[in-house]
Structures are given as structure tokens and as C-alpha cells.
Design a protein with these regions (language model features):
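Transmembrane alpha-helical hairpins and terminal membrane-anchor modules
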Residues: 285-351
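A short, basic-hydrophobic beta/loop patch
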Residues: 137-191
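Surface-exposed polar/charged interaction patches
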Residues: 32, 39-42, 59, 127-131, ...
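Cytosolic juxtamembrane N-terminal segments of multi-pass membrane proteins
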Residues: 235, 239-285
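Charged, amphipathic alpha-helical linkers/stalks
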Residues: 181-233
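C-terminal membrane-proximal segments flanking the terminal transmembrane helix
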Residues: 266-290, 331-374
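Short alpha-helix boundary/capping and kink motifs at helix termini
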Residues: 7-151
Length: 374
């Protein structure tokens, strides 16, 4: 195809700026995704893929960007920051087929005969040749290039990626957008008993769904996998409980918990406040009828004190003392004379005190808060 030859000769290849070791790891991850897509074409294979991504509720395979969000720690965060902070220009390039993540969800090469495959390839080159950064043909492949990781994610033209690979075509012509990624020093990955976690800036925490898929890439990028949870982080149990909260399940993006929020919550729960005996969860007071009887007895004692005035001063003093003691016993449970940590209060009082403290501290810290992405 002469037009195809012209396009290949005049269009530059995609510039790979990551290190060679990262590039090799990226090719390995893309190859794994290709194998997963192949498995997804059968019921048994889909079941195997489902064991890796049990919470995925989309198509039988993951689209490229969802795959990246699932396996690359905080890819979704890096992408959201770039999308909100700047506009990235697009350009035409010949993209190495081996680094492109596709998705054969509509059709695969096996669904097409040789002539149909040739038509798809021809259409790809024709759409590419008629496209420019200012105007993109609807059939032109459109890709996202994560430059620091050396991976390309297909946005438009996902199905044809497998065809180019099966035909052993070394490059796919595409319109490309560049994306960045988080600097390796901002990330930490922890492989712990029963779970794997990624931490961004010592603050945000998300689960690493499939560390075995992305370990080589992350280590090549400069993020070592650690096995001990730092003591200066929020308590691991608290982090896992927040990540396991049912309200965070089946979210479109991986859920991340904020350790600053968890530290603030813990500080509020451990704050001592004035409380009554009625507010403390561990205190078990006598039933209400006991206080009613005591109140009646107090009234009787007070009346008796009045009746004894002037006639039996010693008895009056004794009754007054008893009335005072009984009055103290009746009123002590409702007097805020003890200090207690918020976490030890009864539910209603604990929540009231907790939200009051949290609101106050949040307002105090708002002026000095720093965005973890800044």
C-alpha cells in the first residue's frame, strides 16, 4: 500500500524516554495483559481472570485505562492531577506494537478472515494519513503514552491492537497524548501478610490488586517493595478497616484512604472531654426506679428537716446531713465532673463529641492544609 508506505516514511516513531530496564518491564506487563485478554475469550479463562480482579464488574476484559488504574499504583491519581492541571498537546506517531495495551472486547483476529483483516489494517493507515493534531479521523487510533513507564494505553482502536500483534506489525500509527506519572520517591509499596498496599506521599493508601503483575515494573521504576509497615504511619488495622468499608466497594476507581484523616479521627477519639457518669459507656448505673425512690426519700427527708426545726435540733442536723448525702447521690450521675476519652463514651455522646472536635480541628488546619499532589 503506497499511501501506507508514505505515512511510515514521514511519521516519526514514538519517542521512548524511560530507562531501558523500565521499557523491558513495560513490555512484560503488556504481554501479560495480552494473555489475560486471550483468556477472557472463553468462560473458563474469564473465571481465571476474575480471580485476579474479583471486584471488576465491567466487560469480560478490562479496558486499557481501567487495567492501568487497577494494577499501577495511583495511576488514577496521577491522571486526574494532570487532567485538571494542564492541557497536553497531541501528535502523530508510529507506536511500537509491543508496548500498546489493547482490549479485544468486540472482536478478535480469529473473528476475521484474511481479507477482513487486511481491510482493518488499511483503514487504520488511511484514517491516520487523513488525521492531524487539529482534526482526528474517527477511525484513527488514539493512544495515551505514560512516558515515565513506557506504556501506551489504547483509547480509540483497542480491538485492532491484537490484530497488529498477530500480524507481527512492529508499529501502529496513532494519535498520541503524553501523560506523566508520580515520581518514584513519592511512592512506597508494602507487601504484608494477606494484603499489599501502596502509599503516596506518606498519606494516601490504596490496595495493590495484583502486585505480582506490576512488581517488576515498579522495582525497575525505582519503587522497592517493603515488608514492614512504618510505625509513624496510621495504625495498619485502622487503615485496613477503612479500605474494607462496604461503602467503598465497587467504586469506579481504586479507593484510597487518607492517613491524615485517620490520624485526625484517632486523635479526636483519644481526646479527653468532660463527661457525666451517664455518658460513659462502661458505667452501669442502677435502674431509673432506684433514682425515683431516692428522690421520694429526699423529699421526705427535707420535709422532716422542716418539721424538726426548733424542737429537735440534733435530729434536724442528722436529717439534713442525710438529705445532703442523698441529694449528692441523686445528682452526681448528671454532673460533668469526670474526664473521659471520647472513644469510651456511649454512642450518641461519642458521635457528638467526635464531630464537634473534628469540625474544630479541621477548621483550624484548613489554612495550613497541603494538597498531596502539589
Amino acid at each position: 500500500m503506497n499511501s501506507d508506505t508514505c505515512v511510515v516514511e514521514t511519521t516519526p516513531e514514538l519517542e521512548i524516554t524511560c530507562s531501558p530496564v523500565v521499557a523491558r518491564a513495560a513490555v512484560g506487563l503488556v504481554a501479560i495483559k495480552d494473555e489475560m485478554d486471550a483468556l477472557g475469550r472463553s468462560a473458563a479463562g474469564s473465571a481465571i481472570v476474575g480471580q485476579i480482579f474479583p471486584d471488576w464488574r465491567g466487560h469480560r476484559t478490562l479496558d486499557p485505562h481501567s487495567f492501568a488504574a487497577q494494577v499501577i499504583p495511583f495511576y488514577w491519581y496521577a491522571r486526574s492531577k494532570q487532567s485538571s492541571d494542564s492541557f497536553t498537546p497531541r501528535y502523530l506517531a508510529l507506536v511500537p506494537t509491543s508496548i500498546v495495551v489493547g482490549e479485544s472486547w468486540r472482536w478478535s483476529p480469529a473473528h476475521l478472515n484474511d481479507r477482513e483483516q487486511e481491510k482493518v489494517i488499511e483503514k487504520t493507515f488511511n484514517a491516520f494519513s487523513s488525521s492531524s493534531p487539529e482534526r482526528v479521523d474517527s477511525e484513527c487510533a488514539q493512544y495515551t503514552h505514560i512516558r515515565p513507564l513506557g506504556i501506551v494505553l489504547a483509547h480509540e482502536g483497542k480491538n485492532r491492537v491484537a490484530l497488529f500483534k498477530e500480524r507481527q506489525l512492529t508499529h501502529i500509527p496513532a494519535m498520541v497524548w503524553d501523560e506523566g506519572y508520580l515520581a518514584p520517591e513519592r511512592l512506597r509499596i508494602f507487601e504484608l501478610a494477606g494484603t499489599c498496599l501502596a502509599v503516596l506521599d506518606g498519606r494516601l493508601v490504596e490496595r495493590v490488586v495484583a502486585l505480582h503483575l506490576v512488581r517488576e515494573l515498579m522495582e525497575a521504576y525505582g519503587v522497592e517493595v517493603e515488608r514492614r509497615w512504618p510505625e509513624d504511619f496510621a495504625e495498619l488495622k485502622q487503615v485496613l478497616e477503612d479500605l474494607d468499608d462496604s461503602s467503598t466497594k465497587f467504586h469506579y476507581l481504586p479507593y484510597a484512604t487518607d492517613m491524615d484523616k485517620l490520624r485526625l479521627d484517632a486523635a479526636c477519639l483519644n481526646t479527653e472531654v468532660e463527661a457525666t457518669l451517664l455518658d460513659i459507656d462502661a458505667v452501669r448505673l442502677p435502674p431509673l426506679k432506684t433514682f425515683l425512690h431516692a428522690g421520694i426519700a429526699l423529699v421526705v427527708l427535707l420535709l422532716s428537716v422542716g418539721m424538726c426545726a426548733g424542737r429537735w435540733p440534733n435530729l434536724q442536723l442528722l436529717l439534713a446531713t442525710a438529705a445532703g448525702a442523698l441529694g449528692m447521690l441523686v445528682t452526681v450521675p448528671v454532673l460533668p465532673f469526670v474526664r473521659c476519652k471520647v472513644r469510651h463514651l456511649k454512642d450518641s455522646e461519642r458521635m457528638r463529641q467526635f464531630f464537634d472536635l473534628r469540625h474544630h480541628r479541621t477548621r483550624t488546619q484548613r489554612g495550613t492544609a497541603v494538597d498531596p499532589g502539589s
